[in-house]
Regions:
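Amphipathic alpha-helical segments with low aromatic content
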Residues: 1-35, 165, 174-213
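Short beta-strand/turn micro-motifs at beta-sheet edges
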Residues: 13, 104, 151-155
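Non-catalytic DNA-recognition/assembly elements of restriction-modification systems
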Residues: 26-50
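IQ-motif-like calmodulin-binding regions
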Residues: 40-43, 87, 174
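A short beta-sheet element
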Residues: 69-72, 81-146, 158
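A short glycine-rich beta-alpha junction/loop motif
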Residues: 110-117, 150-174
Length: 213
C-alpha cells in the first residue's frame, strides 16, 4: 500500500496538474517546455484484423495482459473473425470503461475484442510514458466528460472524441523514456511486494491447516 501511495505521489508530481504546463518535479538535464497536443495528432485508430494471434485483455488494475492469465472464462468457442490486432507499443482502451482507467500501453503482440479501441502511435514517442499519462485522474475526468451515454454504465468514449482530447506532454523523447523507466521500476517493486505477500499468505494458510486438523 505504501508503494502504491508513493507511485500516486510520483504521478501527481511528474506530470502537470490540470491547467498547468509543467510538472512539479523534473529529471536533471531536461529544461525543454512541455507542449499541448491533441491525442489525434499522436495516435491513429487501427482497425487491422486477425484471428490467429494471442488474445489480450484490458483491465483497470492490470492494463493490457494475455487473456490466458485471467481467471475469467474467455469463451473459447466465440468467433475471433473481427478481433483487432495489437502490436507492442499500441495504446488500447475499453471504450465503455475508459473513464474508469481501462487503458494501457501494450507490451504484447496479439488481438483484442472489437469492443476495444486500438490507438497506434503516429509519431515517434514512448507509449509506456503515455500509458501512465492516460491513467491520471485528470485524464479520467476528461474521458467521462467526452463519453456518450445515458448513464455511467453505458458511457462510451469513441475514438473521434478520444482524438480531440488535449494532453500536456514532454516534447523531448528522452524525457518521456526516463519518466516511464522510473515509474516502471516502481511498478516492478509493487509486483514483487505483492508476490511476497501472496507467498506469506499461502504459507500461513498451510501452517494453519496443519495445526488444526
Amino acid at each position: 500500500d505504501k508503494l502504491c501511495t508513493v507511485k500516486k505521489s510520483m504521478l501527481d508530481k511528474m506530470f502537470p496538474k490540470l491547467g498547468e504546463t509543467e510538472p512539479e518535479i523534473r529529471f536533471e538535464g531536461f529544461t525543454d517546455p512541455w507542449e499541448q497536443r491533441k491525442l489525434g495528432g499522436l495516435f491513429f485508430e487501427s482497425n487491422e484484423r486477425s484471428s490467429s494471434m494471442e488474445i489480450l485483455s484490458v483491465s483497470v488494475a492490470k492494463g493490457i495482459y494475455p487473456a490466458s492469465e485471467s481467471d475469467r472464462d474467455t469463451n473459447p468457442g466465440a468467433s475471433l473473425a473481427n478481433y483487432k490486432v495489437v502490436h507492442k507499443g499500441d495504446v488500447v482502451y475499453n471504450s465503455m470503461r475508459m473513464w474508469q482507467g481501462a487503458v494501457g500501453s501494450s507490451d504484447y503482440d496479439g488481438i483484442v475484442s472489437p469492443a476495444y479501441v486500438v490507438a497506434r502511435p503516429a509519431i515517434e514517442l514512448d507509449s509506456t510514458c503515455f500509458g501512465y499519462l492516460l491513467k491520471r485522474p485528470e485524464m479520467l475526468y476528461k474521458y467521462l466528460c467526452d463519453s456518450q451515454g445515458n448513464s455511467k454504465d453505458t458511457q462510451t468514449l469513441k475514438y473521434n472524441r478520444f482524438a480531440d482530447i488535449e494532453v500536456t506532454m514532454p516534447a523531448n523523447l528522452e524525457e518521456q523514456r526516463v519518466i516511464s523507466a522510473c515509474l516502471g521500476r516502481v511498478d516492478t517493486l509493487i509486483t514483487l511486494h505483492q508476490r511476497k505477500l501472496e507467498l506469506l499468505r499461502n504459507i500461513k494458510k498451510s501452517l494453519l491447516d496443519r495445526m488444526f486438523v
